[in-house]
Amino acid sequence: MIESGYLRALVLSLAAWLSLYLIFTWTIDPYGVSPIRLEFPRINALKPKRTDIDRILKPYEVWRYQPRTIFLGTSRANQSLDPSTLDGTRFAPAYNAAIPGGASMKMHAAYLEQYLRLDHNLRTVIVELFLPHMVGGPTPTWADFIGNTVSLFASANTLWDSLATLAYNAVSGRPIHQIERAGYFYHPNRPDPKTLFERFPSYIWSAAVHQPDRATFDQAAFDGALEIIQIARANNLELIFLIGPSHPYPDYYYDAIGAWGVIEEWLTKLSALATVYSFSQPNGWVDEPISPHMTYWYDTFHYSLAMGRGMLRSLAGAPTSGLPDNFMERLTPDRVASNIERRRAAVRRWAEANPSLVAQFEEARRKWLASEKTSH
Amino acid sequence: MLFNSYVFIFCFLPIVLAGYALLRRGSNLLWPVGWLVLASLVYYAWWRPEFLLLLLFSITVNFGFGTLIIDGGLSRAQSRAILTIGIVFNLCLLGYFKYAGFFVANVDSILGLQWAVPSIVLPIGISFITFQKIAFLVDAHRGLVRNFTLLNYAFFVTFFPQLIAGPITHHSEIMPQIGPSQRRDLAADIAVGMSIFVVGLFKKVVIADSLAVYADAGYATVKAGHPLDSASAWVTVLSYSFQLYYDFSGYSDMAVGLARMFGFQLPVNFYSPYKSTSIIDFWRRWHITLSRFLRDYLYIPLGGNRHGTLRRYLNLGIVMLLGGLWHGANWTFVIWGGLHGLMLTVNHAWRALPVSRSLAFKTRLADRVAVLVTFTAVTLAWVLFRSETLADAKAMFAYLWPMTADPMGWPSFKGLLRTQFTDLRYALTLTEWFRPRELWPAILPPDYLATATRPMGLLLVGVGIATFAMPNTYQIFGRFKPALGLPEETLGSGILRRLDWRVAIIVAGMFLLAVLRLSHVSPFLYYQF
């Protein structure tokens, strides 16, 4: 038997379930996107699920917050550039739209185009340059934007992640890594950087890195950078390229594979076309000795929020104290060669002072080369 | 267009249903049936419109053959000749689109002719549509076809609930329903049909798609040449076994539910196959209409069991080999079919032995053991079905074999038990549960699926309980006569006595969960700095 009001009950039940779903997920707000923004300690203050979803979350937040300045880049910019550092400067409000994990110049160009459509307040774009990442990657589409935004509000993951957020806040309550509201990634319980530095040789000389022994000028990647320059010019945007700090250990790697020529070619060409600031000059911050407690480095590639704050304040011309004299340097084509020469000289000094790290690196490299030879 | 898509659920279906409700108010059957044919053609054309021309061409030609056989005044021999031409025509279409590449690749590899392997896009649903049309021609030749008009025939072939993946229906099952369907209580049919559709959608989207992530990850790891430990290999094959079950079960429920919304009953196609106590029983419950087609149009014409035991087993083997090939143009499917043929033969041979009829095999315990043995055999056979190459299948079988003391063998199950069940620090860490990623890492650690994808163990146990202990959709909705061909006891003793507000609350909750599951927040796993 079918009750006469069954279909009506079905519709009403669906409306009731949907209301419950919205009330619950908008209150717990696992991704920090809720329109009602309620925050309760031990309930939803910590957002353990607001992580690893940069490509889904950030276009939505750029549209929602309409920042004046955005950062594009990889995990370095993502982890270390806190946009609130720029508060009170001409760049504010800023948003860190860096996408960790395989972000490429082409991808940055595509995101920039999308952000220009989403954010009518956009005036400045700061692009991080990280040379090993100048390879291909997925580019965003409007369908992605709509699908991703819908998924943040209406998906089973949202429901599940709301439950997980509630459980984490109620049971654990310990600060946890997450994407902060301004888009940068915050990790309160970083592992010991010394251990991570020691893992660098076995990581870089492994199958996880594509052709670690080669450095060639990637024209497609450079075309991506040119595309960014063209988009910025066409839309009257201020464009700044940042060469982030590079610790001497990865610089030793670039030296070992003969990458300086490629880096010089990149920077010479780019600095002829756009504003490029380098933060890679050897100094007390960049060359910080490796230890279990480092102030300016999280690991071999990732500089710390403290370093990032110094970079952004230097860039904004804000008063700073304690920064190394050569912390920021504007690169022009005629200055690139000397900048790189200083880095090379610093690497050699560092290698002499750190023979055990060099030995580990060379041993990992020798093993990798031997295995490559066998496999061919 | 998939049943489990926003466009189908929120656009196509409401429009088609509303149009149908309006048009059936008149007395002329042409309008509602024509509307359903039109909707079905739109549905078919959604993916690649050019294949609509192929479908229309095929319908026209088959209608011509049907007209000749039914109304052509042909002798029996002439009718048989037309039937043969019709079958050859349909098999040629199927052969070209589905098997040309496979055939050329194999001939080329044997003879070394350096032929270019053609890349032919397979029209969606062609395997089902071909069998349906062949069944129609045979029925026409046997004089079983009534109400034969172009519109009715087009409706029979294209009716969208069963167009893409069955059930494979007989003309005689659908045609008699056209007239009565217009006089049925539409609201009641929508209520029953929608409820069954939601159950199917839930099975497909919430259960099958959740399991698919883990099955895909395991098979992708093997395909990439990386090892799995035994526990992870079992997680992979069990995930796939249940994924396939709920995928097909969900699809069958959705098809039955959709047809019912328009007042039609489709034949039952799936009836708790993992509760089977033998392989013979399994094929009476899994893809029932395919088994019926193969029996009626292949096994019996081959001679069936009429020419002795050996010939019967040979016929079974041929039918299952071809049944395997029908599922896909790959040796893995052929061997999967052959393996099922072999298991059926062994099963029949066992039943022929007097000992099989002893009371010791009639107990409840014996039945449970038989269910377990059948499920294990079917699950292991799915390895061939799912693997892309025989080498991948061989590698997966090797990983499934745990008879080693190294961490990849038996000890891997200790890790699974600890992280998934016994060590609550792992098993109950809610924030680490259910993390299907946008991209799996390039290389999964061998124990990843067994230990890191929590609560995979609890999920498999839950799904196992649901599969083996819960009633199926027809046992729940039996009183509402959801499908054709259901056992009498199912029709009379359905668990639901009435569709009321309590059922509405559950069905609405399932619908919301399923619709929410259509959209994913897929975290990205950063595997390279």
Q: Where in the sequence are the language-model features?
A:
Chain A
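Membrane-embedded segments
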Residues: 66-156
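Short extracytoplasmic
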Residues: 44-71
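Secreted/periplasmic serine-hydrolase-like ester/acetyl group-modifying domain
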Residues: 124-131, 138-235, 326-376
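Hydrophobic membrane-insertion alpha-helices, especially the h-region
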Residues: 8-29
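Alpha-helical transmembrane signal-anchor/signal-peptide segments
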Residues: 28-53
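Well-ordered, non-membrane alpha-helical segments in soluble/globular domains
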Residues: 106-112, 218-226, 257-270
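C-terminal regions of proteins
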Residues: 261-369
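Active-site segments of SGNH/GDSL-like serine hydrolases
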Residues: 231-255
